[in-house]
Amino acid sequence: MEAIFSYRIFIFSWDLIRFAKLVIYYDCTNYFFELEQADGLKQYGASKENRPLPIVQMGLFMDSDGVPLAFSVNPGNTNEQTTMVPLEKKLVEDFSLSRLVVCTDAGLSALSNRKYNSKGNRGFITTQSIKKLKGFLKEWCLDSKDWHLKDSLQKYDISELDEEKDSDKIFYKERWINENGLEQHLIVSYSIKYRDYLRYVRSGQINRAQNLITNNPKEIDHNRQTDFKRFVKKNSVTPEGELAEQSFLELNEDVIRKEEQYDGFYAVCTNLEDDASAIIEVNKQRWQIEECFRIMKSEFKARPVYLHRDDRIKAHFMICFLSLILYRYLDKQLGSKYSCEKLLRGLKDMNFLKIEGRGFLPTYAKTEFTDDLEKAFGINTSMQIVTIEKMRNICHQTKE
């Protein structure tokens, strides 16, 4: 049902947006309900917000221009790794795609998904956790030698880089690996700027951890893998090696040191033979699908959901999906000049007062946004009065 809806929108929008069909992106997110009873699509499942409420799961495909292509709505307790292939099959069938590269994050890169997209003319690009690689591959990734720059055969030792001159450069290394019967192209990048960013983020988390130790030690028992509390440990032994009368909290220096060794490194796996830098660039565009979810949740108020029936829940997300397509179209027509918030606010402010027998009087102030909008779509509604005939023509224009 969801994929068919996407297909119809795709056909109607073909003349409006040139869909990039070679590379598509897939991701999942959850939407919570202000209800406590789980039934139908509403089920208790893993939630990033950690709210004790039922959720539904949405899977979304997007093209390389950030335009959504298809979505599915699944029960909140569904394993998200199983949701991609069924929707992808429907997408390929509806859009008659003959060649496809699917880009995902590590959480959706199950071996079965990688193998599926290694058949025929399909391909995959997925982020790869260096920490989860086999020991010898992990050592190879972190080895300071045999790195190179884009379009260069010169070898570099990243332990000898100039902090200032090389701060904006991205270094690469690559090799083919065979994991569980699947040949994959492992690509690793290293950047001083990315290293410094990770250190900055961790520094803030360490400060929060130290503050927790000092001011709120009772909160230590509630932590997650990416929580700053992972840097805190309980200790029952004094620095002198004696058993303490009472356990105490301190920073876990071992965890901090282990994480530091990965600073600046980023890895992807793919079955493509393309240039490493090109593949990394494709993977970087995943931020657009994360932005799609953020826009739906914040600007389109897709959550919390207050609906009970499954058919109405699906209808709710169809409306959000259609709104997202229209927003992407408007954004591209305006040259991505305005944030989503400003664009929506500008549209909401464009109101008219109907004057019987004469037409419509604009009640909004003429701004740079309204000028850009009128120029992009070849309309003019900021005149003193828009006649009834003129408004009919404008409305007809939007349906062509």
Model regions: which residues?
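Anion-binding and metal-coordination hotspots
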Residues: 1-400
